[in-house]
């Protein structure tokens, strides 16, 4: 017993130190979130109390719950949680027929026993977050064994009905389908709530797929949200730690899983703030605009897809003026201008892409050469210029085919370029005569 007591004392000491730090978690001690058992029928290990986990019961059964309350002025990385109020209405761009408010968003993140949404994958921890009375509340429900899952899901069901929007990170594909499956398997019904999804993985990939090494939440938050986790338990280890708890009954290793999930919830709120600020055009009031040309262009293209046609031009102009813009970025922006009928800038961008590829004529310069060949042939009727660009594209394609055996698509492209060159030579000769 002395060893257990020493361990508990050390845990309590660590918690007290964290609570004395700026921005410490405020435990939910005043508001009852569910009926607490009034007798001693179920004994809860004192170790749970060291990280503010309580045993709760409802008409279905029991489960564990941890509740943390953050003040609205709490800063998580670059953003304060109070910014949700200003940013949330702009998130209506995800669902133009709905009006978004910060109070109507529920944030959801699961810790599960495995991957996929099949019957063998169980969410052993469900984290939810929401605004309440200018505070950001995080609730984390945990089951100590499978028999508690139904009670946990019943509690979640009661919470969901108060919200319209569900904010996740890959939740449209993973978290929410898994929750729905668990509701059905536990006899709690189907389609009990149909959320308006705010899945922030998709805009993250749209904007950062090439400028960040990974679009995992932990990487996005560090590189773009200014959030640095210390002594974090990786999400991939959460199932292992949970199974360890099931095997020996010691809850201590799960404290790190609770903390990991808690940070995920805060980061989800900050992503809502970031994308909301981008959509309402106020982002530069809070953080500097992106300084990488590709991120500028991808951000602008995403804003256009979200219906914010008036916002991207400044980003596009900045990207075009950057001397270090990659040829692929210039070609991407040129494709947008071509579609919009802005031929003058499209031509300038294609030409700039080729100039920037002078040391290495890569795929972007190849694409730019083909586009310029088509432009000068069909729009300007300058067959000599068109022939020059077509020859450059053919030479690149031919050299590439000698290094890597071409597939059917590449062979068809070579044949198309041969035909284009032959046609341009005929047109050029006729034009001279």
Identify the meaning behind each predicted range.
Residues 206, 212-289:
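Acidic, Mg2+-coordinating catalytic module of metal-dependent nucleases/exonucleases
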């Amino acid at each position: 017993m002395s060893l257990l007591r020493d361990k508990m004392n050390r845990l309590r000491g660590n918690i007290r130190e964290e609570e004395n730090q700026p921005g410490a978690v405020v435990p939910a001690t005043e508001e009852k979130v569910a009926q607490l058992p009034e007798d001693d029928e179920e004994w809860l290990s004192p170790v749970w109390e060291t990280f503010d986990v309580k045993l709760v019961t409802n008409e279905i059964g029991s489960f564990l719950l941890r509740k943390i309350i953050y003040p609205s002025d709490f800063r998580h990385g670059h953003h304060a949680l109070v910014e949700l109020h200003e940013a949330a209405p702009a998130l209506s761009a995800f669902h133009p027929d709905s009006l978004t408010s910060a109070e109507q968003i529920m944030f959801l993140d699961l810790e599960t026993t495995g991957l996929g949404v099949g019957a063998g994958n169980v969410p052993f921890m469900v984290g939810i977050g929401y605004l309440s009375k200018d505070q950001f509340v995080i609730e984390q429900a945990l089951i100590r064994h499978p028999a508690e899952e139904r009670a946990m899901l019943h509690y979640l069901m009661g919470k969901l009905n108060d919200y319209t929007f569900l904010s996740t990170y890959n939740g449209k594909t993973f978290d929410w389908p898994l929750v729905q499956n668990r509701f059905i398997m536990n006899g709690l019904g189907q389609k009990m709530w149909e959320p308006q999804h705010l899945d922030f993985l998709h805009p993250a990939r749209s904007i950062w797929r090439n400028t960040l090494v990974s679009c995992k939440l932990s990487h996005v938050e560090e590189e773009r949200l200014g959030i640095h986790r210390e002594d974090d338990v990786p999400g991939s280890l959460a199932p292992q730690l949970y199974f360890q708890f099931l095997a020996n009954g010691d809850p201590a290793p799960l404290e790190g899983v609770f903390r990991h999930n808690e940070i995920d919830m805060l980061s989800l709120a900050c992503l809502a703030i970031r994308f909301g600020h981008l959509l309402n055009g106020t982002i530069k009031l809070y953080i500097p605009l992106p300084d990488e040309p590709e991120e500028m262009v991808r951000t602008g293209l995403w804003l256009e897809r979200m219906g914010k046609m008036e916002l991207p031009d400044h980003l596009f102009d900045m990207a075009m003026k950057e001397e270090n813009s990659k040829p692929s970025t210039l070609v991407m922006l040129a494709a947008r201008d071509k579609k919009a009928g802005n031929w003058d800038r499209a031509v300038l961008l294609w030409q700039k892409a080729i100039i920037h590829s002078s040391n290495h004529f890569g795929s972007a310069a190849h694409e730019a050469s083909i586009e310029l060949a088509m432009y000068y042939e069909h729009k300007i009727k300058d067959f000599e210029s068109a022939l020059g660009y077509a020859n450059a594209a053919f030479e690149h394609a031919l050299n590439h085919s000698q290094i890597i055996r071409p597939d059917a698509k590449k062979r068809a492209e070579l044949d198309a370029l041969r035909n284009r060159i032959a046609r341009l030579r005929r047109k050029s000769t006729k034009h001279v005569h």
